[in-house]
Amino acid sequence: MHSAWNAFAWRGCMKHNEKNFQLYRKEELFMDLKGTKINFLGDSITEGAGTSCVEARFTTLMKEIAGVAEIRNYGIGGTRIARQQTVTNEQFDKNDYCTRFSAMDDDADVIVVFGGTNDYGHGDAPFGTFSDRTPETFCGAVHYLFRGLIEKYPTKPIVVITPLHRENDTVPNALHGKTLKDYVDVIREGAEMYSLPVLDLFASFGVCPDIPAQKAAYCPDGLHPNDAGNRKIAEKLKTFLEAL
């Protein structure tokens, strides 16, 4: 009787502790985005190309679906991560990510970096090798950018979003003979090296623009997500950030 009661009490204690542990873990693992400020560094997709209005951008939608207090949108259409060899007065030529990340506001709670598709699409910087540390090659620019962001925001979550699939992205680019996946792989590897969390939309966005029905539904021009595509990004980003 005594031992049976002890066993019962032990099981009850374990259940109680397990419940408390689960609640503790849930609180520990859940990031409350309400009231936060997020810096978004990106290209035309971040800027909102393809959407019908500002409110339909995935960045702005984070206010609606996650309660984010302030969105700082540093998206500039056409920009690349790496510096260009031929620089013009066009914004997309002179404002690569490595050049402009340092000008972002310092007081962000979360930083989100979303780029690489333009490096594949029309960037003239050499692809380089993973040992590069210069912003003049794509591989080097990934290192330069990630390390620079960590130094600027040493205690804040820095999230990397891979490029989305785009139409015909298995075709090697003319200058370097690289597919979009080659660029994505460098971004993944660089993020892993610096222990930055990756929202891998190349692998898990669920949209392949080479399939006409999905292209029509989510990115009619084969590259820029429409309103439905932006909401899909926002929902995935919310879930990802909350789990950090």
Question: Where are the regions that the model predicts?
Answer:
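N-terminal secretory targeting modules
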Residues: 1-41, 45-72, 104-107, 151-156, ...
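Conserved SGNH/GDSL esterase-like catalytic core that processes O-acyl groups on lipids
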Residues: 32-39, 45-140
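Alpha-helical cap/lid subdomain in secreted, periplasmic
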Residues: 93-244
